[in-house]
Amino acid sequence: MKVIFTQDVKGKGKKGEVKDVPVGYANNFLLKKNMAVEATPGNLRQLEQKNKAAEAERQQEIEDAKKLKEQLSEIEVEVSAKTGEGGKLFGSVSTKQITQALQQQHDIKIDKRKMDLPNGIHALGYTNVPVKLDKEVEGTIRVHTVEQ
């Protein structure tokens, strides 16, 4: 019997997958526990529509990420930090400080965990910080660290 899985079933199939399973297994387990539905032409059409909608949504997310990447490449974020002798920073500039400055100066909100800056910024001047905007789209933020 062909079924469409409505959720992941370990060892059998993933959500949205269409598979042939034994009739008894389908009737007594998968269908009873709402883990799958019978693969009728109507259900298959519905699954296809869901997949198309999900693909369109995914394309829109990628498009938005590309626009944000373009926007980020044109701007500069200024972060001020306390310094000691010789222009050395006390501590470092973290991704949290960069996201706050980006929000205040340019009204752009980015999650700090998407920035690839493991040790922070330890010097005055310009630094390019890589940002993972999407699985497929990566941009950079130009950060200018100035003396407070």
Swiss-Prot record:
Single GO BP term: translation
InterPro entries linked: Ribosomal_bL9 (IPR000244), Ribosomal_bL9/RNase_H1_N (IPR009027), Ribosomal_bL9_bac/chp (IPR020594), Ribosomal_bL9_C (IPR020069), Ribosomal_bL9_C_sf (IPR036791), Ribosomal_bL9_N (IPR020070), Ribosomal_bL9_N_sf (IPR036935)
UniProt GO MF annotations: rRNA binding; structural constituent of ribosome
Gene3D superfamilies xrefs: Ribosomal protein L9, C-terminal domain, Ribosomal protein L9, N-terminal domain
Alphabetically ordered keywords of this record: Ribonucleoprotein, Ribosomal protein, RNA-binding, rRNA-binding
UniProt GO cellular component terms: ribonucleoprotein complex; ribosome
SUPFAM superfamilies cross-referenced by the UniProt entry: L9 N-domain-like, Ribosomal protein L9 C-domain
Pfam families found in the cross-reference section: Ribosomal_L9_C, Ribosomal_L9_N
Top-level taxon: Bacteria
Cross-referenced NCBIfam families: L9 (TIGR00158)
Family the UniProt entry places it in: Belongs to the bacterial ribosomal protein bL9 family.
Protein function: Binds to the 23S rRNA.
Name of protein: Large ribosomal subunit protein bL9
Organism lineage: Bacteria, Bacillati, Bacillota, Bacilli, Bacillales
